[in-house]
């Protein structure tokens, strides 16, 4: 199955100090946080109130990096309006010679079933699912473009694309996009006990404070 959306922490870790309750919620099997080195101090004024300063080097090494998944879906259907039959089906729009193709969009990454190929690098101008509508009465039997377009600003890679059949016998196409996201200023974080704060500044590693042993906070 493919969920509508999902966020996965890439490098989740179990807490160093545990309670007996953890054995009942399977926290060690599904870690939801990371163990970081924290310095409680004032540094530069960008961590007033609930702000947090982050080490740029730690972020580049993968700290709090997440993978965001979102899904696009389309269904074939057949309808009749005032005696006119209209069928909507999956198709490679360019090969079918459909009318109404949207200018500026890239249809070249669709396979023979009309789904974008897996591992294709995404942007908001690449068609996700190719669909065409055919009505003998209105368009003389010629296919009209009804493709599914990505949302504005869509980036990432095509993680999964597959087709199945619904209860009514019509096909269902689903495409999952994965996008790697990095912490940025304004993102919200919290401790394991729920104390929240936002990222106020990302500091280069060479400018971070350090202990006499050379340990720098994350």
Regions from the PLM with identified roles:
Residues 1-218:
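Conduit-forming functional cores of very large proteins
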